[in-house]
């Protein structure tokens, strides 16, 4: 959903300053960016899409203000090759489930993998290949960070462009039964058929290790997040987060104070923003001009606590 923080200053000021939406960033407004996504078989997700908003908030929480999230794209599995990869993943998921007796052994998680722009086409067309973008300290394979730790993945990468563009793949990872892999390992496959993947720690996992023998059957790239980040990333302290509320909920609350004619205008502006005819900044300014900040502050403070996450 299209979330609005319950502090009106944060809603209106932060979104204009930090480029917090796809449209404002300019990342996917040009024909070249659209052709880039089309070439990879990806579909841009807009604000209001559930997957977009979950990924955006997860990234924003994990990366902080030092990174600018430019766009979120989903693998559409449009061509024969990508659909075959999806089917392959599903077949191996069933096989792992059968191997472990159907007792939940086919564990699937989401994990982050940092890639360069020139690697993207190869990965989406042919799959992962070596050499991989890791230090090899846990053996030969693909290392992914848990979905709540995008910064760990991003810190392992280096921006190859002057503008600081980074690319993160959010992948479905078929972990199955994991074993601990000690640092310094030189293995490229599980220690025995009992195991399907590796981790650095079973309790506090920072790395998923998918062996080179498994990385094109047990990893399925599903989302691509384009990020602009400084060369030297730091683990910034987590900031206090204000509660959020859905924009449609805000419109519903405004309908108790504004005449129907003004609500219709706000709904039209919101629809225009969803269809990318206007940017989020323009939507915000137009809503403010209709309601005034005083009414917005009152409604958001009164209603925001009901939709905290």
UniProtKB/Swiss-Prot annotation:
It is found in: Nucleus matrix. Residues 238-309 form the RST domain. This is Probable inactive poly [ADP-ribose] polymerase SRO5. GO terms for cellular component: mitochondrion; nuclear matrix. The lineage of its organism: Eukaryota, Viridiplantae, Streptophyta, Embryophyta, Tracheophyta. Interacts with dehydration-responsive DREB2 proteins and a number of transcription factors belonging to several protein families. GO terms for biological process: cellular response to hypoxia; reactive oxygen species metabolic process; response to salt stress. Its main location: nucleus. InterPro entries: Poly(ADP-ribose)pol_cat_dom (IPR012317), RCD1/SRO1-5 (IPR044964), RST (IPR022003). Probable inactive ADP-ribosyltransferase that may be involved in stress and developmental responses.
